[in-house]
Amino acid sequence: MTDSVVLQSAVRVPTPPPGTSYSPQPSVSRKRSPPSRSPSPRRRRSPPGDSLKENGDAPRIDPERAVERERQLAERLRQHEKREAARKPMTEEEKQAAAKAEYEKLLNMRSGGTYIPPARLRALQAQITDKNSKEYQRMAWEALKKSINGLINKVNVSNIKFIVPELFGENLVRGRGLFCRSIMKAQAASLPFTPIYAAMAAIVNTKLPQVGELLLNRLIVQFRKAFKRNDKAVCISSTTFIAHLCNQQVAHEMLAAQILLLLLHKPTDDSVEIAVGLTREVGQHLEEMSPPIALAVFDQFRNILHEADIDKRVQYMIEVLFQVRKDRYKDNPAIKDELDLVEEEDQITHRIGLDDEIDTQDGLNVFKYDPQWEEHEEAYKKLKAEILGEGSDDDEEDEDETDESSDEEEEERQMEIKDQSNTDLVNLRRTIYLTIMSSIDFEECCHKLMKISLPPGLEPELPSMIIECCSQERTYSKFYGLIGERFAKINRLWSDLFEAAFAKYYDTIHRYETNRLRNIARFFGHMLSTDAIGWHVMSVIHLNEDETTSSSRIFIKILFQDLGEHLGLAKLQERMRDEILRPSFEGLFPLDNPRNTRFSINYFTSIGFGILTEDMREHLKNLPKPTVPALPARDAESDSESVSSHSTCSTCTGSSRSRSRSYSYSRSPSRSRGRRRSISRGRSYSRSVSGSSRGRSYTPSYSRSRSPVPKSRRRSVSYSRSRSPAGRRRSSVSRTPPRRVRGKSYDSRSPSRSVTPPRRRTSYSRRDRSYSRSLSRSVTPPLRAVDARARGRRYSSQSLSPPRRRAERSVSPQRPPPGRRPRGDSLSRSPSPPPRYAREQRRRRNSSSASASRSPPHRDSNRRRSLSRTPPRRGRASDYL
């Protein structure tokens, strides 16, 4: 019961004093008072607050949190006071004090300071203007450290001449510790840049020797510590830097000799390796400045090589070192030409021994307050002006001297080029040829060719020699294709040169025999299939009958066959249809001229690449059928006029003049062989004026004639004037220039196909093209008899006018030779009589003639000879006599 009572009680039991306990005792030893008969006193319940305080289950208050709340409250009050104070204008002293306090607080934080935005930091620094204050000097120190570190990190061979003046712009006297620490750290991180850092240190040493001495002291101490700790990496970096400082004559060569003897005194693998590296860097300088030291060092190496028990790798390193010495350090010069920036007489050499007591002045690495800060800054400004001023004058003098010397060198070089240009080119080609021929595989060949120094402007010789060597092989070797591919993919320069070589060799491919041509084509096929050169080079190819030769067509054939082998027809077709490259293939697949398109289709089909011509075939099918120049156009219109004859008749009292104009519209579908028929529609207007009765008669006539179309379609325009005397004969003068046999006819409106039987008289005609308004296609055989006055060509056609009873002769002022047959277009539509001879039947030609006669109609004439220009049939020479 007592346990249950204790558990249910809400009253905290007080802590017992030491030595006592409230643990329950045995019931025997416990004494109880006798029960009281009086009633128990009345108790009051305690208030809730008191009970919670006395309750053991209530949460206890954390004193640390209470302290934190009080601190935050105080901070808020302080911020409130600051805001209240900020409302009031602050004096300059108060601003300075506030800025200094804030800056000091940021610098003294345990984490090194929190990040401050640059704008806020600049504003904070701008508020601190007291140069004698510690805060201002600390800010200047931080800025100096960042500037020196940044300049050292970005120095290289090309900009060292510009970095050094900027470096002198900083206070290197105050920051010499920062300079030495930064340059040693950068050199250890990048050993290949050691010559550059040594050159920079040498330049600084000429003006500020204390900086160079401090750097050398720290390097020696660093080497000592690393040697004792067996730190190989630090030893290598330190000895490399010391070696290049010896080359620049900042350190004496005796220091390098001491280090070498120390490393080789008790040779181990690591010490010998470090000594070999140091000797390779400083060996040439030792050979020049102290030959006995160099001899002693190499004797020690020789003894180690023969006697010491060292690793094979280290033995090989020593052997390589002796080979480097034998080659006179051609790959390890003491000072490179671009880093030889200091004259020997200007350099200050520090003689510091390896065992000397050295003070590294580590206190220069950290900030220290300088009470005379302004005086020291002014002193360095004067020193800087002196250094940079002298440097600028020297630079100007050096520039003048270099300009003069460069002009002289250029003149000498030009003279040398003029004297030895051909020799140099031959030597270069010989070197490239021997390099290619002596290589085992293409990778070795590319490696050797990359080492060849090509003179400026002779870079195209390398691709040219590769292609020439490839062409001289009996069969194509993939060796050359792989070389060209590797060079084209290494640099864009070689890719452009190979593309230019493609255009050059395609233009001159006719100079090569078939075997060399095949090798060149396969070489470029390999280059194109591997995308080593761009496919746009094919824009130089124009595949047509006029711009290609047999050699170029063979070249294109072999090229596409090689592309088909490497890519396959499907991929090759896809490449040829590439929208980006399509303009470059317009010459290969021409669409501008149907003749060129057919030629390209036939060419690719003949070499087995007809699949590439599908687009051209489709284009050719979809072309509108053009008006063939040799065929008369359908629904074409032609106007023809012929001024026919001015004739006078002796029996008549007056003169008669007649003019006739005939306009015809013809439709003549032509066929290839056999009889060709044309349906022509003509309309003629005739106007006749006679002496006795002057009247005008316009006689529109429409006629249709079907006559065979001659093979040669010609167009002629004739102006004829005929004068008919009163006698039997009428003479007509025709100004009809004859037409050529092979010509083109344009705008023939009425093709008439009439064959006129041969006449008895013959007229001589010139071989020339005749232009007449009378367009006819009738074949007129020559006359049999020769008339002295009739020297022109006669053209006969059947017109709608009544036939004359008397024959008239036409005399032409021009005398065409009888060899060729002129063209004539006739608008007459009367059916022509059939030819009388079988020869006329075989040789009849289709012609469209439009004739307009200006002779008055005569009723008493049985046969009519008009002055139309109808091509005669082709006969023998005897027919014209």
UniProtKB/Swiss-Prot annotation:
Compositionally biased tracts (Acidic residues):
391-413
Q: Which GO terms describe its cellular component?
A: catalytic step 2 spliceosome; cytoplasm
Q: What does this protein do?
A: Involved in pre-mRNA splicing.
Composition bias type Basic and acidic residues, residue spans: 51-98
Quaternary structure, per UniProt, is:
Associated with the spliceosome.
Q: Which PANTHER family does the entry link to?
A: CELL CYCLE CONTROL PROTEIN CWF22-RELATED, PRE-MRNA-SPLICING FACTOR CWC22 HOMOLOG
Q: What range(s) does the MIF4G domain occupy? A: 145-328
Provide the GO biological process annotations: mRNA splicing, via spliceosome
UniProt keyword annotation of S-adenosyl-L-methionine present: no
Official protein name in the record: Pre-mRNA-splicing factor cwc22
| Residues of the MI domain | 427-543
Q: Which UniProt keywords apply?
A: Cytoplasm, mRNA processing, mRNA splicing, Nucleus, Spliceosome
GO terms for molecular function, please? RNA binding
Tell me which SMART domains the record gives. MA3, MIF4G
Where is this protein primarily located?
cytoplasm
Give the Low complexity compositional bias ranges: 641-669, 681-710, 748-757, 772-781
What family is reported? Answer: Belongs to the CWC22 family.
Name the Gene3D superfamilies for this protein: 1.25.40.180
